[in-house]
Amino acid sequence: MRSGVIAKKVGMTRLFMEDGKQVPVTVLQLDKLQVVAQRTAEKDGYSAVQLGAGTAKAKRTTKAMRGHFAAASVEPKRKVAEFRVAPENLINVGEEITADHYFEGQYVDVSGTSIGKGFAGAMKRHNFGGLRASHGVSISHRSHGSTGQCQDPGKVFKGKKMAGHMGAARVTTQNLQVVRTDADRGLIMIKGAVPGSKGGWVTIKDAVKKPVPENVILPAALKSAAEEAKRLAEEAAAAAEAEAKAAEEAAAAEAAAAEEAALKQAEAQIEAEKKEGDE
């Protein structure tokens, strides 16, 4: 089990695939997602990483949280969340996670706070059919109807589907597919809709009802590792370029030496022929 990520919902758009099909996607952005703290079994009784996303003003952050972020040597964060991980998948404090944490085709579970609808009736809240439009029904066309029984039990059971507050609740949508990622801009594009409004925070985890892919990055796709790989690649490219340049210079020097030797040989041959003519 590895860490999930915190992302901001940017909005929805569509992508055109190579076969011409268009896929509706939700764009999620990773905004300076860093590890703020660790939870270990020895100290806390469980293994987890605490992540922080976004940047908050210091004056809008409590003194306790300012101290918490200062201990991790990170900027104050707007959103903080914990993710349970296996002990071997703990991430060092201060590390930044990139959008390459997920790959195209992978299935994920996305959790967020749904858009609040206020007080809603049973037809909107629970998809009830409502009462008859006529034939004796007046005023109560969108009513949910009877809610109880007779004198026994003489009450409304808990959990009865009735009118009430709708939305603004924690919702998880499972088995959503990642269509595309953009590590440079920190974007993850997921097929379909995810809970929440534009600008809201969501959490993304590996799908629990799908097998874990073999090619996932453990413990996470870290910016430091990507920068190190990029640096090594640049050094290897520079070394290869220098080696090619040295080989080219050596070949040019060898060709120049061969040309000079051929010129000297030609001059010597001309001198020899001239001497033979004088004799």
Curated annotation (Swiss-Prot):
Domain of life: Bacteria
The keyword Disulfide bond belongs to this UniProt entry's keyword annotation: no
Gene3D superfamilies according to UniProt: 3.30.160.810, Translation factors
Residue stretches in coiled coil: none
Pfam families: Ribosomal_L3 (PF00297)
A single MF term (Gene Ontology): rRNA binding
Entry PTM: Methylated by PrmB.
One GO BP annotation of this record: translation
Keywords: Methylation, Ribonucleoprotein, Ribosomal protein, RNA-binding, rRNA-binding
Gene Ontology cellular component annotations, sorted alphabetically: cytosolic large ribosomal subunit
Chain positions found as N5-methylglutamine: Q151
Summary of subunit composition and partner proteins: Part of the 50S ribosomal subunit. Forms a cluster with proteins L14 and L19.
Family statement: Belongs to the universal ribosomal protein uL3 family.
Annotated function: One of the primary rRNA binding proteins, it binds directly near the 3'-end of the 23S rRNA, where it nucleates assembly of the 50S subunit.
Protein's recorded name: Large ribosomal subunit protein uL3
Primary gene name: rplC
